[in-house]
């Protein structure tokens, strides 16, 4: 993590820090700390049914900050904020720990299964106003097992996935070759691994 942006906001005499990564969003539970997240669209192998995630070689650093600005109810352009959303139970707690890494719902794009990988490299203490940042890390994601259904057929133009799916490569696409998938299912080759280095 090379760094993040911080914009200070004063609400009723309390200074909050609005943190963000360029080009990415934040945690979005209303009233809870809007910590920045990194989101990557990853391709899933046709035969992968179980996802295993491990974080390796993580290096943490601690910083003192103001309270992290809470996520607010989204408003339409014509609406004005009437009430400031804040979870007092969360902000009066010693620690707020979201999942470091999570994978969203599986989707299908041009015949390729994919999902959003979300990384929130923070540990936050609202009471102490301290933030720990995982500034260096390696995320190892492996897929084991097989799906019961046959692999889908790739739609024409799947090369457009290059640049859309962060782990696009020939090995991933080969898992969607129906004949190859059937061959793989007759062997012990049932793992597909890759690393994300932050």
PLM region spans:
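Extracellular pro-sequences of secreted precursors
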Residues: 1-198
């Amino acid at each position: 993590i090379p760094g993040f942006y911080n914009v200070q906001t004063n609400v009723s005499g309390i200074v909050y820090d609005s943190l963000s990564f360029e080009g990415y969003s934040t945690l979005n539970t209303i009233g809870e700390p809007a910590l920045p997240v990194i989101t990557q669209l990853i391709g899933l192998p046709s035969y992968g049914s179980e996802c295993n995630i491990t974080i390796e070689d993580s290096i943490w650093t601690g910083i003192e900050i103001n309270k992290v600005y809470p996520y607010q109810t989204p408003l339409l352009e014509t609406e004005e904020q009437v009430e400031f959303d804040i979870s007092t139970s969360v902000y009066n707690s010693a620690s707020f720990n979201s999942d470091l890494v999570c994978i969203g719902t599986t989707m299908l794009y041009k015949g390729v299964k994919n999902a959003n990988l979300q990384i929130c490299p923070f540990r936050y203490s609202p009471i102490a106003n301290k933030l720990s940042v995982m500034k260096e890390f390696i995320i190892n994601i492996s897929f084991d097992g097989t799906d019961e259904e046959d692999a889908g057929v790739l739609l024409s133009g799947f090369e457009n996935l290059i640049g859309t799916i962060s782990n696009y490569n020939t090995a991933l696409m080969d898992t969607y070759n129906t004949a190859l998938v059937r061959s793989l299912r007759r062997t012990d080759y049932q793992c597909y691994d890759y690393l994300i280095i932050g």
